[in-house]
């Protein structure tokens, strides 16, 4: 079944607050095998002008992937997850994610289109501090195979 373009523009309530911890950043950096000391050592991060350790740029996926799941759970979207593959992911960082940040994620459906018998669903997740400071915009495209 093809996705309904009427869902374009639909926004979802912000996520619960996620507090970014040094240990989580270090674990993520280790999983990437990234030795950058700014991800583990507050002094190294301070030497770069940051108030605490910073996260690798792709750390945003920890929050944005979970936040985008509201789309999968939306019965109006009616996405058959068994037919879905991840087509694209982009991050635009407004500033680095830092240890101690208290972040919320708000998800919006940006587009739905059909191409070659597949539906393409693009979502945008805005990561902000709980005070509203923009931190990262994540855009992802899901491909629902053979539904259009």
Roles of regions detected by a PLM:
Residues 1-86:
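Hot-dog-fold acyl-thioester-processing enzymes
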Residues 1-3, 88, 92-148:
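HotDog/MaoC-like acyl-thioester-processing domains
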């Amino acid at each position: 079944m093809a996705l309904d373009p009427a869902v374009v523009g639909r926004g979802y309530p912000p996520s619960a607050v996620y507090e970014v911890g040094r240990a989580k950043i270090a674990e993520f950096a280790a999983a990437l095998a990234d030795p950058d000391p700014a991800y583990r050592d507050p002094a190294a991060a301070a030497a770069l002008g940051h108030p605490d350790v910073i996260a690798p740029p792709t750390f945003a996926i920890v929050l944005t992937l979970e936040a985008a799941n509201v789309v999968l759970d939306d019965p109006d979207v009616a996405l058959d997850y068994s037919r879905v593959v991840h087509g694209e992911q982009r991050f635009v960082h407004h500033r680095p994610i830092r240890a101690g940040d208290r972040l919320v994620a708000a998800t919006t459906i940006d587009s739905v289109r059909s191409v070659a018998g597949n539906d393409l669903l693009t979502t945008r997740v805005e990561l902000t501090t709980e005070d509203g400071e923009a931190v990262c915009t994540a855009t992802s495209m899901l491909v629902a195979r053979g539904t259009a």
